[in-house]
Amino acid sequence: VQMRNVDPFLEFFGIPQGYSRGGEYVPREFKAGGSGVIISQDGYIVTNHHVVDNATELKVKLYDGRTFQAKVVGTDPTTEVALIKIEGENLPTLAFGDSDALRLGEWVLAIGSPFDLQSTITAGIVSAKSRNLGAIPNQYRVESFIQTDAAVNPGNSGGALVNTRGELVGINTLIKSQTGTYMGYSFAIPSAIV
């Protein structure tokens, strides 16, 4: 998932983001990336709220190279889940698994596009369940993260966490890091919440 957006930092501080030759204000746009999971053959995709929040344009690129315009169907900032839609038929989907049945030490795979490296898969184990980190900036947040040591980096947000049967057990959402990149602590929203 790629989005185009106005720079919220500059907007917050009232810093001009760009002007046309005639002096008319033109917001500066930037591109960002994330991942998503197709959950229906007609194009519904689950991703993270922060991947699509404030986006002015969404494009979805599939692993086979096809590109689609997408629209936001809905977001839930309390769970950090978003649903978007592309127009397509017979799209490949991922079946839901039972995140409640995951056991500590069980192998899982994180799938996504970290640093715009499409269709990247990393492996790790379930390190903990039901983590409440206070990471979702909403007083009504619902947090119960799956912790894993599968590598998750910027661009993985919204991507799939699957069990060894290839079933969706979580949506990769965040990392705990002092550098902003993977340091061994990755967190996913359980499929039971999605």
Question: Across the structure, where does each feature detected by a protein language model lie?
Answer:
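Serine-dependent protease modules
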Residues: V1-V194
